């Protein structure tokens, strides 16, 4: 049973996350030959203030992009 964990910043809708999980499931069915019922996907979301890239939190990066 393949288990996939997706770590990402918060902010996507439930519909977006469900679509992503469906697409990942189908990719595993196609490429690994497993049944969809065997695929487990978990999303771990972090607040934007708890994620950093390039020495700036995602909150800081978003604020800089608006300028």
UniProtKB/Swiss-Prot annotation:
Keywords from the UniProt entry: Isomerase
Q: Does the keyword Isomerase apply?
A: yes
The record's InterPro entries line, in alphabetical order, gives: 4-OT-like_dom (IPR004370), Tautomerase/MIF_sf (IPR014347)
Per the record, the coiled-coil ranges are none
| Active site feature | 2
Enzyme type, top EC level = isomerase
Nucleotide-binding recorded as keyword: no
Q: Which domain of life, per UniProt?
A: Bacteria
Q: Name one GO molecular function term.
A: isomerase activity
Annotated EC:
5.3.2.-
Family membership, please give it.
Belongs to the 4-oxalocrotonate tautomerase family.
Q: What is this protein called?
A: Probable tautomerase bsl7456
């Amino acid at each position: 049973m393949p288990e996939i964990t997706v770590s990402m910043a918060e902010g996507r809708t439930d519909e977006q996350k469900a679509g992503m999980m469906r697409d990942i499931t189908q990719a595993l069915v196609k490429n690994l030959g497993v049944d969809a019922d065997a695929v487990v996907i978990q999303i771990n979301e972090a607040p934007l203030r708890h994620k950093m890239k390039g020495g700036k939190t995602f909150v800081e990066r978003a604020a800089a992009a608006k300028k």
